[in-house]
Structures are given as C-alpha cells and as structure tokens.
Curated annotation (Swiss-Prot):
GO terms for molecular function: glutamate-1-semialdehyde 2,1-aminomutase activity; pyridoxal phosphate binding; transaminase activity. GO terms for biological process: protoporphyrinogen IX biosynthetic process. It comes from the Bacteria. SUPFAM superfamilies: PLP-dependent transferases (SSF53383). One of its GO terms (cellular component) is cytoplasm. This is Glutamate-1-semialdehyde 2,1-aminomutase. Its EC number is 5.4.3.8. It catalyses: (S)-4-amino-5-oxopentanoate = 5-aminolevulinate. Pathway: Porphyrin-containing compound metabolism; protoporphyrin-IX biosynthesis; 5-aminolevulinate from L-glutamyl-tRNA(Glu): step 2/2. PANTHER family: GLUTAMATE-1-SEMIALDEHYDE 2,1-AMINOMUTASE, GLUTAMATE-1-SEMIALDEHYDE 2,1-AMINOMUTASE 1, CHLOROPLASTIC-RELATED. It holds the Pfam family Aminotran_3. InterPro entries: 4pyrrol_synth_GluAld_NH2Trfase, Aminotrans_3, Aminotrans_3_PPA_site, PyrdxlP-dep_Trfase, PyrdxlP-dep_Trfase_major, PyrdxlP-dep_Trfase_small.
Length: 426
C-alpha cells in the first residue's frame, strides 16, 4: 500500500469519511485521496514523493501559488507577536482599508473566519435590514453549509424549498426559494409570488460549484433591476471570484453593483478568513451599532489578517490578472484543441483565473441542467488518467479549476500535452 492509502485507512477510523471536508475524499471520482506533504509554487507534493501540477489551489485561495514568500514572511512576523488577542488590532484597520479600497461597493466590512460565516451573516443582515424572511438562491450554486442554504428546489419553481441534507428543518428550508441560474424569468416569478416577503437574492456571479458557469450578459444586471423593483437586497457571493476574476471581483468584471458582498479564500491568502460588507446604511444595522447580531472569537485574528493583507497587496500589483487570464485562456484553448484532435466532445468555460471542463455534446453549458447532462463517468476516467500524468485537477465534475500566477507557460503546455495523451486513450 502507498503511504496515502495507509493514512486514508487510519483517517477513516478517526475522522468521518477520513477527511475534514467531503470533496477531499475523492467520492466524486473514486479511489484514494492524495495526502499532501508540502506545496510550492504551482506544485503539490504528496506523501509518496510524487509531484503534481496543481489546478485546485486549495480550492481557490492560492492565486499567487503555494508558499509565497511575502505571505509566509508576514505570517511568521505576526506569529512572533502573538497568535490571538480577542481585541482590536491595527492590522484589522489596515485590512479593512485595503479591502474597501479594492472593492469600491464595500463602504464597510466585517471580518469573519470562513465563506460560510460570511454568507450566513450577510443573509441574516439582509433579513434584519428589510424585515423580510425569504431569500432567493440558485440551483447548482453553493454558498456554504448554513441551514438556510442547504436547500433544493421543490417540485416546481414556485414551491417552497426542501432540505437537501438531513438535519435541516423544513421550517428553515421553506424560506429559501431556489431559482434557475441564468434564467431571469424564474426569478421574476418568485418575486411576483412573494412580492413583500423576499429579503435578498444571493448569487455566485460566476457559478463555481457546478464546475464553472459564467453568467449570461443580461443575468446579473437583471437581478439588480429585480431587487430594485421589489425592494430586496442583492448579495453577490465573491468567496470564489473575489480578487480572482478581476481585482475588484466579478462585480467589476460584469459591471453590477451589489448591496452586500461576501468574500473568502484569496482574502486570507491561505488562512481561514471570510468577510462581508457593502452599503453603509445596511452595515450600520450590524451589532454593536445595530440590532442584527454577529460575532466571532477568532474573527480578525492577527495571523490571518497579516496573511490576507500580504496576499491582497501582491494580488493588486500590475499584470497579475492579465497573467491569470493569459494562462487560463491558453489552457482552455489547448484542451479544446487536444480534445478535438481525439474526437472527444468537450466544452471548457473560463473567466479570469477560473475554468471548467465539461464532457458534453452540447455547444455550451450555461445552467445546472446543462451541467447535469454532462458525462460524469468520462470525467472520472479523465481525472485519474491526468493524475497519473502528474496533473491534479478538482476531484469532481462539479468543481471549478483554479489558475495561479505561479504557473508557467511550460506548466500549461505540459498539461495540454498530458491531456492529449489521455484523450487518445479515453
């Protein structure tokens, strides 16, 4: 047995499923998950000594690559001053100043410890600010594991939501309406059914949890207009897209103004950080100056703030996003060319430093239904064959891939060459 196999066997006796987040267990592709010893730049190194070109990037945070010296040094320096104080620090102020400068729609920001905390807190704030209970989310979008978000659509577009996990009470789920991503008609129908009850829409501006599905041109502006028409707030979940699709996020890339924004992943530089913020009048409803409660023992802790501050300063440097786009575009085009040579039907969506690989005969993939029609079994084989070639892709047909500026054009070309060999056998 490999060392990864031995560790996985031991882990399953101690940790549910052997992992601390389900997708890591390789249940979407089968087989034994890699146990990682270290990472540097664009590469992961497993406990058995094999190196992989990494397109998971810790599920998004590693936009600069692994073990970036500026972030590493910032963490070391902060740790020498203490790990956590439970009191305000200067770095929290500097971090808030930087975030609100980089994302102009955020007048104020509150730091938390994860993307899930950010989204659930933003929704609570929207409900408290509007005095309404219902929310709209979209099929195939993921906003963390808060109870109100682990909800699937009922039997029709206007039926009440149903829990999609045991442990979520039906009384919670009934306040969540699930509409179709990229379908404004379904959203309007929900508002017309409940015109005075919907507090907010929460949306991934690029859906990254049904692989990578960008918005149609009219979708995000249409959501903004519907929120304005019916007095609801628009929450854009930029946990995945923030500082990646563009420096000011997908909201800047697609020119839409939210009321609240949720951030995570890159904002922590690899440390556990989330944030939410937006309009000053809305944020003023948050405790301790307003009635909507939110708190966290480790929120804004000095180590995480130091890592995030260093990361964002590097991400804000000229050329970063142009490099991400160039590398991702080359990868997408190369994969399509290699698939076409082998007669493999393939769609590759990409925007900024995100991409998605779909085995499908369709000309495009724009919604959850399109994603579910793709050939998952072929993806599983592709994943394992690419892994054997030393390329680590997301171990699920429903997760986006992530580029970093640490990837070289040689890494990209080697990945395309590996895919060409795999497609020939697929």
């Amino acid at each position: 047995m490999s060392k990864s196999e031995n560790l996985y066997s031991a882990a399953r006796e101690l940790i549910p499923g052997g992992v601390n987040s389900p997708v890591r267990a390789f249940t979407g592709v089968g087989g034994t998950p890699l146990f990682i010893e270290k990472a540097d730049g664009a590469y992961l190194y497993d406990v058995d000594g094999k190196a992989y070109i990494d397109y998971v990037g810790s599920w998004g945070p590693m936009v600069l690559g692994h073990n970036h010296p500026a972030i590493r040094n910032a963490v070391i320096e902060a740790a020498e001053r203490g790990l956590s104080f439970g009191a305000p620090t200067e770095m929290e102020v500097k971090m808030a100043q930087l975030v609100t400068e980089l994302v102009p729609t955020m007048d104020m920001v509150r730091m938390v410890n994860s993307g899930t905390e950010a989204t659930m807190s933003a929704i609570r704030l929207a409900r408290g600010f509007t005095g309404r209970d219902k929310i709209i989310k979209f099929e195939g979008c993921y906003h963390g594991h808060a109870d109100c978000l682990l909800v699937k659509a009922g039997s029709g577009a206007l039926t009440l939501g149903q829990p999609n996990s045991p442990g979520v009470p039906a009384d919670f789920a009934k306040h969540t309406l699930t509409c179709t991503y990229n379908d404004l008609a379904s959203v309007r129908a929900a508002f017309e059914q409940y015109p005075q009850e919907i507090a907010c829409i929460i949306v991934e501006p690029v859906a990254g949890n049904m692989n990578c599905v960008p918005p149609l041109p009219e979708f995000l502006p249409g959501l903004r207009a519907l929120c304005d028409e019916f007095g609801a707030l628009l929450i854009i979940d930029e946990v995945m897209t923030g500082f990646r699709v563009a420096l000011a996020g997908a909201q800047d890339y697609y020119d839409v103004v939210p009321d609240l924004t949720c951030l995570g992943k890159i904002i922590g530089g690899g440390m556990p950080v989330g944030a939410f913020g937006g309009r000053r009048d809305v944020m003023d409803a948050l405790a301790p100056i307003g009635p909507v409660y939110q708190a966290g023992t480790l929120s804004g802790n000095p180590i995480a703030m130091a890592a995030g501050f260093a990361c964002l300063n590097e991400v804000a440097q000229p050329g970063v996003h142009e490099t991400l786009d160039e590398l991702t575009t080359r990868l997408a085009e190369g994969l399509l060319e290699a698939a076409e040579e082998a007669g493999i039907p393939l769609v590759v969506n990409h925007v900024g430093g995100m991409f998605g690989i779909f085995f499908t005969d369709a000309e495009s993939v724009t919604c959850y239904q399109d994603v579910m029609a793709c050939d998952v079994e072929r993806f599983k084989r592709f994943f394992h064959m690419m892994l054997d070639e030393g390329v680590y892709l997301a171990p699920s047909a429903f997760e986006a891939g992530f580029m970093s500026v640490a990837h070289s054009m040689e890494d990209i070309n080697n990945t395309i060459d590996a895919a060409r060999r795999v497609f020939a056998k697929l």
